[in-house]
Amino acid sequence: MNKSSRFYLKFISFIFILQFHSLLSDAQWYDPEKVNKKAREIYESAYEEAVQRKFTECLVHLEEALKLEPKFVEVYLSRAGIYADIKNYPLSVKDFETAFTMDSVFSDTYLLPFSISLAGTGQFDKALLTVNRFLATPGINDRSIKAANYRKSVYEFAIKYAAQHPAGKYIFAPENMGDSINTSDLEYFPSLTIDGKKMIFTRRINNDEDFYESNLINGTWSKALPVTGKINTNLNEGAQNISQDGQWLIFTGCNYPEGIGSCDLYIAYKTKNGGWTEPENLGPTVNTDFWESSPSLSPDKKDLYFASSQPGGFGGKDIWVSHRQPNGKWGRPRNLGADVNTDGDEGCPFIHADNRSLYFNSNGHMGYGMTDLYVSRKLDDSTWSTPDNLGYPINTIDDEGSLIVASDGRTSYYASEGLASRGGLDLYRFQLRDDIKAAKTLWVKGRVFDKKTKA
């Protein structure tokens, strides 16, 4: 293999995470000497930009190279990899198919990444056929076989799940929550009161995380503003949960001077003027020398669910629960057990207002390839059902974060890098399917008066 051929191989190896093709002994390539010299120079510049993850500039240069050399197959393959890296799977599939049409000698080498892009568009049947073709290719190495078999199991799971959970008339249609809430910065970790009229979420600006609040007024969300009080600091506050009645705010504070571990749980209380008290560390009963995050209060504020890396669990990060004692203190946390937790990581728990449906994410349960969203139902005080994957397209082949569900049991909110995003992660709302929704929860709003004083 000459120097230029190794260069092309290096380029595409960088783009595809698995880098399996760099180990194939029988890969065949175009003769670089027959490629337009200027196009090849532009392609080399694009490679340097890809190394620096300057994908926008890289894509521009790849397009320029194609104008000079319309049948430059490596450009299509490389661009397919970049599109996959930025999660534009439809364009990735299109470029793969164009390259394969031009020269089928490449198809055996690129069947595995092609299958991943197909899965990214939800074409799991075709992805399975493609990965099986790859596994039948002579001479592939053990690393490639292992990666392909893993992907095969994912595609088989997706096909089986779709058969067992027919969508019927259900349509997954995430709706961006608009400019009142979303900006060119990152918005994530939404939290909602039971009446659905107040949302608090995390916004990250220049790597600084703070809490913002928006109120639903006459059906429209107000422009989100930083929460008042002493909660937002020059440190990082995130992964918050507002109590169903809107009176408590529990959140994650990392690297605080008074912190016990790397990230601790803190609580603040609503004041009469609408602000928040100075946050209090929940103390060494809940917080450990390790990592605690993603709190979620039960509707009666008696149970606190959270994720932790403390010892005594099943994997790296598990979901735990602490019960509030009669004296108001939080009790020693209890691991939710092997039905919920795995030898992988579980996080972002959300206990619904029905006090039974627990939504969370995990990379340890079988799913679509990365971190997926699941729901488990409380059977009794210490037992949970086997988690149900929320399915495609709520879950994708990429990482999913947190999800919350409104009191109606169906309306859900989550953060996503959707095509309608203002920039990076935005907050979206959508409706859950019947089989994964929570129970509709009724609530009553009122005031309590003293019978004698009327106060």
Where are each of the predicted segments found?
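Short, conserved micro-motifs composed of acidic
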Residues: 78, 120, 124, 129-454
